[in-house]
């Protein structure tokens, strides 16, 4: 649902899993985990999902943890890769600027500055949840913890339905070591990665890690001078300093930087074949993997190419001080910022009907203090406070060729050329012919019951703009204060009870500014005129036919508003208007856990999650009108979960499971109205399901795992009653193994895996035609085709290591059977009857070389 916000302001348990953990404490050699004689990493697992160190079996909710070694074994470089192996976790990545991250069917990927996330992403406890800045490379990672269910009590804002915490590898002071890695593959894929850990002294350690990767696009560009689509170009670096002046005080300073400059996203129309915009010759077919003829409109954003330019950086300071044997003080201080600009061909055709740009700027500061109590007695607890300050700005710009947009509205992109299929856009010279445009204007007017006179039709046709530009700027400033606490009471050696509470206060300001950038829209004014009563309709139509009407300033002599197409301007063509809101709310949890032995845990937990009130801003309904501010009620969810975690056969067999039920009130969603997407309260919703995983490590040579998740997520009221949540497959499954054997002087290993997900819809309306008819949409959507049926992907790696893994070579393949699938459908063009589809990744393969020292 990429940049759907571009039109959003327009006026026109049986028990199942929490996935067995694969985490471990700091490795004993460079990047290698400690193992026992069976190859089992779980002997040393430590997680901090409950803000204190525990074994995963002790955590009373569904928790998935993966070690850095697991990420390496399965070549997991980003969240989309990770999601395929994690039950109940889904990631749709159109570009690093537009991920949709979902836990148990709940997601949000809106780019509005004022939107609040439902799933929170953390780096070492620092929230990085704004979608435009959340997608980061996973490299030199100690572990990733995925906590499912409402985690507002533990993690605070944004963790309505879960949290993902990336624990980055920290410097070690006991050794100096490093790693270098290189990969190359098809599609001209190259990756370079390195890590260096320096033990400067027994109390000071330094660590630097970085990754750079590049790959050609996966969808061919059919127009000269335009790069193939969906390419990869990412560079990321991290530097960290650890100081331990004593065993009671640890200080970490971490700096992160990432830059992404991929080519444009392949928003491909399946209604219109790609054609040469000059000759009209058909260049390829309608398949999502077929080539695309996309290009930005002339002069848009200073002539920038399609693609993304994104920078993300941050500085984090961590302090852990043992004040006494019972009290430990933790501090997390962080500053983070990101800036993005993405240029998009929204319409998905070879004609520059609509070109879009989204620019996002964000900066945030956060401070958390937490005091933990643990005197080895029956009670453990913590209390804390946090402050969060964020400033965000989203700029959405669009450029229309009004002549081509008119042809689409009139269902005449084929130019009415005799014998030319409706699927083949005509040459630009045909569609820009004033005579044809005049006829199309009369046809559109006729559909409104209005007889457009020939002279007025000719005059308006002559005034249609090839490059009408307008923009929306929405800003949000947030100050939030949190107080929180949690306590666990061990009633007996086998039974413990716990509860937590968090209070949050938000102080928000939302502002909006809309403007037309090069005069009024003639097409927008014409469509607006058709909805007016007489005599105003004819008066406005006649004025729009005056030569040069697009650029004549409004005056007493020419009282024609500055019309936009999607963004009607605020006062004085761009005044910034703001509104304020203050919000308070509580979240809580309560749980019980029974542990008959150290390797078995049964638990039940109830939790309340809360997404803060949203103060949304829509542009005026008419030029120079008042912006439309809407306060959307806080969304709440009540979660009930029971689960079991156990290790059998001397910790060789792990079985985990969870059953859950969620009940939502004031579910926030986006609803399409014409060319407008508005934030609405969809009312009630619910989901229930289960997750289950098994892991078996019979020997040092063989490790197997499998997991399955079922999630039934549905709306329960309003026009969406009965619809599935978007990006919420009912069934997901993954399985894999690692087989290794000593061969000659080294060790050979083979790691195949298969992942499966069932059918998903890409919008909450499930692309149901009855929900997409005028006036809800500008043009009717007659087909339910914006979904992806179930599919499976197979990957494999074959490697050989020498000298205990110091030197390693491997070959790999992803999507081994070249399965065709789509990762998104609909998108911004859907609002104008131009849905687009984005192809998933094809088969890729290559070789990797690694050296450790």
What are these regions (language model features)?
Residues 1-74, 80-85, 247-248, 315, ...:
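N-terminal Sec signal peptide and the immediately downstream disordered periplasmic leader
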Residues 38-173, 642:
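Acidic, small-polar-rich N-terminal luminal/periplasmic segments of exported/outer-membrane proteins
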Residues 43, 392, 398-405, 755-773, ...:
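C-terminal beta-signal and adjacent terminal beta-strands/loops
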Residues 116-118, 130, 139-148, 153-223, ...:
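Outer-membrane beta-barrel translocator/receptor signature
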Residues 174-175, 181-183, 190, 195-289, ...:
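Periplasmic-side early beta-strands and strand-to-turn transitions of outer-membrane beta-barrels
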Residues 218-230, 265-301, 346-355, 397-471, ...:
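Solvent-exposed loop segments that connect transmembrane elements
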Residues 318-322, 328-344, 595-619, 631-688, ...:
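Membrane-embedded beta-barrel scaffold of Gram-negative outer-membrane proteins
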Residues 382, 386, 493-497, 652-664, ...:
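Gram-negative outer-membrane beta-barrel transporters
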């Amino acid at each position: 649902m990429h940049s759907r916000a571009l039109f959003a302001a327009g006026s026109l348990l049986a028990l199942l899993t929490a996935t067995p953990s694969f985490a471990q404490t700091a490795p004993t050699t460079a990047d290698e985990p400690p193992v026992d004689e069976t190859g089992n990493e779980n002997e040393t697992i430590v997680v901090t999902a409950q803000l204190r160190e525990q074994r995963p079996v002790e955590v009373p909710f569904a928790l998935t943890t993966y070690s850095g070694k697991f990420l390496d074994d399965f070549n997991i470089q980003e969240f989309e890769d990770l999601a395929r192996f994690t039950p109940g976790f889904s990631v749709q990545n159109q570009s690093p600027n537009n991920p949709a991250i979902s836990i148990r069917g709940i997601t949000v990927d809106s780019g509005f500055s004022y939107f609040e996330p439902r799933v929170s992403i953390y780096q070492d406890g620092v929230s990085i949840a704004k979608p435009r800045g959340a997608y980061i490379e996973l490299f030199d990672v100690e572990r990733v913890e995925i906590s499912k269910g409402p985690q507002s009590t533990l993690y605070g804002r944004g963790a309505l339905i879960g949290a993902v915490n990336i624990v980055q590898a920290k410097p070690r002071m006991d050794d100096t070591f490093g790693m270098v890695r290189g990969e190359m593959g098809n599609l001209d894929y190259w990756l370079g990665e390195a890590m260096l850990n320096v033990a400067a002294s027994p109390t000071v350690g330094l660590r630097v890690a970085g990754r750079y990767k590049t790959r050609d696009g996966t969808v061919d560009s059919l127009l000269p001078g335009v790069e193939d689509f969906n390419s990869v170009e990412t560079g990321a670096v991290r530097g960290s300093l650890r100081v331990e002046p004593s065993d009671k005080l640890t200080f970490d300073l971490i700096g992160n930087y990432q830059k992404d400059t991929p080519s444009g996203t392949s928003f491909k129309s399946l209604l219109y074949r790609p054609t040469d915009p000059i000759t009209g010759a058909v260049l390829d077919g309608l398949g999502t993997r077929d080539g695309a003829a996309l290009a930005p409109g002339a002069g848009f954003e200073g002539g920038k190419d399609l693609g993304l330019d994104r920078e993300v950086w941050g500085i984090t300071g961590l302090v852990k001080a043992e004040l006494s044997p019972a009290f430990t003080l933790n501090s997390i201080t962080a500053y983070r910022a990101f800036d993005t600009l993405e240029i998009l061909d929204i319409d998905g055709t070879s004609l520059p009907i609509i070109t879009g740009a989204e620019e996002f700027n964000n900066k945030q500061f956060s401070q958390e203090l937490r005091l933990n109590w643990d005197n080895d007695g029956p009670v453990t607890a913590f209390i804390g406070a946090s402050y969060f300050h964020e400033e965000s700005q989203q700029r959405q710009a669009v450029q229309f060729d009004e002549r081509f947009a008119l042809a689409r509205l009139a269902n005449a992109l084929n130019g009415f050329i005799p014998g030319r299929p409706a699927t083949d856009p005509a040459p630009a010279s045909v569609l820009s012919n004033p005579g044809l445009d005049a006829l199309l204007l009369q046809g559109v007017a006729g559909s409104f019951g209005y007889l457009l006179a020939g002279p007025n039709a000719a005059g308006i046709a002559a005034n249609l703009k090839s490059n009408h530009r307008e923009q929306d700027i929405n800003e949000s400033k947030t100050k939030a204060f949190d107080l929180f606490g949690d306590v666990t009471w061990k009633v007996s050696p086998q039974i413990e009870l716990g509860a937590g509470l968090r209070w949050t206060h938000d102080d928000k300001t939302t502002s909006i500014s809309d403007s037309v950038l090069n005069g009024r829209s003639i097409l927008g004014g014409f469509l607006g005129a058709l909805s007016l009563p007489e005599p105003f309709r004819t008066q406005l139509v006649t004025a729009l036919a005056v030569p040069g009407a697009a650029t004549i300033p409004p005056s007493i002599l020419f009282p024609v508003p500055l019309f936009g197409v999607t963004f009607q301007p605020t006062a004085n063509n761009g005044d910034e208007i703001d509104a304020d809101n203050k919000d308070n709310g509580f979240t809580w949890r309560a749980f019980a856990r029974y542990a008959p032995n150290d390797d078995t845990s049964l638990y039940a937990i109830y939790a309340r999650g809360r997404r803060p009130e949203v103060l949304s801003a829509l542009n005026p309904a008419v030029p120079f009108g008042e912006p439309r501010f809407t306060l959307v009620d806080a969304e709440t969810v009540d979660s009930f979960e029971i689960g079991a975690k156990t290790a059998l056969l001397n910790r060789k067999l792990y079985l985990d499971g969870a059953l859950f039920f969620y009940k939502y009130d004031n579910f926030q969603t986006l609803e399409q109205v014409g060319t407008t997407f508005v934030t609405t309260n969809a009312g009630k919703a619910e989901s229930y399901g289960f997750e289950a995983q098994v892991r078996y490590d019979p020997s040092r040579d063989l490790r197997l795992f499998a997991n399955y998740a079922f999630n039934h997520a549905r709306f329960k009221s309003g026009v969406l009653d009965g619809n599935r949540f978007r990006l919420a497959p009912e069934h997901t499954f993954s399985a894999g193994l690692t087989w290794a054997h000593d061969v000659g002087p080294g060790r050979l290993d083979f790691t195949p895996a298969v992942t499966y997900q069932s059918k998903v819809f890409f919008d909450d309306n499930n692309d149901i035609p009855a929900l997409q008819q005028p006036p809800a949409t500008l043009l009717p959507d007659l087909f339910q085709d914006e979904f992806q049926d179930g599919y499976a992907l197979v990957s494999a790696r074959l490697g050989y290591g020498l000298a205990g893994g110091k030197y390693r070579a491997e070959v790999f393949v992803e999507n081994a059977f070249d399965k065709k699938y789509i990762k998104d459908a609909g998108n911004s063009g859907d609002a104008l009857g131009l849905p687009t589809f984005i192809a998933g990744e094809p088969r890729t393969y290559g070789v990797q070389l690694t050296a450790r020292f």
